[in-house]
């Protein structure tokens, strides 16, 4: 009873803190002058990390097994994984763009886990015999960590696509006006008008330079995180195959979860391969990673809606 109450308290505290962090972070985006807001949001994410960690440990002690046996517990672990990814660069004193991805992802997964859809899973139950194995921690934790890293990397690629497309649309729509008005020095009659045009052109060039730097950094961070997530995913699939052979006598059974895990692995293997091809631009690679964002959610969450296959123990009903 004590552990159940503590788990309930930690769940709501972590959700409340991350909600405040999101609010602070949105304010800091619009008000750059307030330096303390960024530090406050980072401290809030640290507090969220410890709350979710305490929640997982409490549920582990209360249930007697590692908390990864159903969708609710895996969502909590996914939320914890997002907070870990957020904090690693922070402790290394590297300010990056991950916070724009990890903080909303944490509140989304934490909010859904505590929603009414998964109320039946909030109470810990005895795990099915197939899950009573030491491979549970190895396999599922690696898969969830892989999903978290791949989702973050994919969202960075989506951001790269949005910035690039906005730039292309802006250049296309203003190309004629820019050429006619900014560079038609014949029509400029006074020196001060020419000076204004040069200042405007210089400002545009400076803005384009910083946009190019932003795109490059997003591309680099996306590649690094996806590479890490791909490693976790590979370890998770291999450990799952060994576990399946022990439990069911076969390394691979092509049930829906395994099939979509293989599709996910293949897609990001293609992404990493395209990164080695110098003829492929970052925009094209980002398209592949963006498709991977949808594939991951189908693999992790969409397949659970079917409620069939060897992984049906992680499914839930919408009624």
UniProtKB/Swiss-Prot annotation:
The keyword Protein biosynthesis does not apply. Keywords: Chloroplast, Cytochrome c-type biogenesis, Membrane, Plastid, Thylakoid, Transmembrane, Transmembrane helix. One of its GO terms (biological process) is cytochrome complex assembly. It is found in: Plastid, Chloroplast thylakoid membrane. The chain crosses the membrane at residues 9-29, 48-68, 71-91, 98-118, 143-163, 225-245, 258-275, 286-306. GO terms for molecular function: heme binding. Pfam families: Cytochrom_C_asm. It comes from Eucalyptus globulus subsp. globulus (Tasmanian blue gum). This is Cytochrome c biogenesis protein CcsA. The gene is ccsA. NCBIfam families: cytochr_II_ccsB (TIGR03144).
């Amino acid at each position: 009873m004590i552990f159940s109450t503590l788990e309930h308290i930690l769940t709501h505290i972590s959700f409340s803190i991350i909600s405040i962090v999101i609010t602070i972070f949105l304010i800091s985006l619009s008000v750059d002058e307030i330096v303390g807001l960024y530090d406050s949001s980072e401290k809030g994410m640290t507090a969220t990390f410890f709350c979710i960690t305490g929640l997982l440990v409490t549920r582990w002690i209360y249930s007697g097994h590692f908390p990864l046996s159903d969708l609710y517990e895996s969502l909590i672990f996914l939320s914890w994984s997002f907070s870990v990814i957020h904090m690693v660069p922070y402790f290394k004193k590297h300010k990056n763009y991950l916070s724009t991805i990890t903080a909303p992802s944490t509140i989304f997964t934490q909010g859904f886990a505590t929603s009414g859809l998964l109320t039946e899973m909030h109470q810990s139950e005895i795990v099915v015999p197939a899950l009573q194995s030491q491979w549970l921690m190895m396999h599922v934790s690696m898969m969830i960590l892989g999903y978290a890293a791949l989702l973050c990397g994919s969202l960075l690629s989506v951001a790269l696509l949005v910035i690039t497309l906005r730039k292309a649309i802006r250049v296309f729509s203003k190309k004629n006006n820019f050429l006619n008005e900014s560079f038609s020095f014949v029509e400029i009659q006074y020196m001060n008008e020419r000076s204004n045009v040069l200042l405007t052109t210089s400002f545009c060039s400076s803005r384009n330079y910083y946009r190019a730097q932003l795109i490059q950094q997003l591309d680099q961070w996306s590649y690094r995180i996806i590479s890490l997530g791909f490693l976790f995913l590979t370890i998770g699939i291999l450990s799952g195959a060994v576990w399946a052979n022990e439990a069911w006598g076969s390394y691979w059974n092509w049930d829906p979860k395994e099939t979509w895990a293989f599709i996910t692995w293949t897609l990001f293997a293609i992404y990493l391969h395209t990164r080695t091809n110098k003829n492929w631009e970052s925009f094209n690679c980002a398209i592949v990673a963006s498709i991977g964002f949808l594939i991951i959610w189908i693999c992790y969450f969409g397949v659970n809606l079917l409620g069939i296959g060897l992984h049906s123990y992680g499914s839930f009903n919408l009624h």
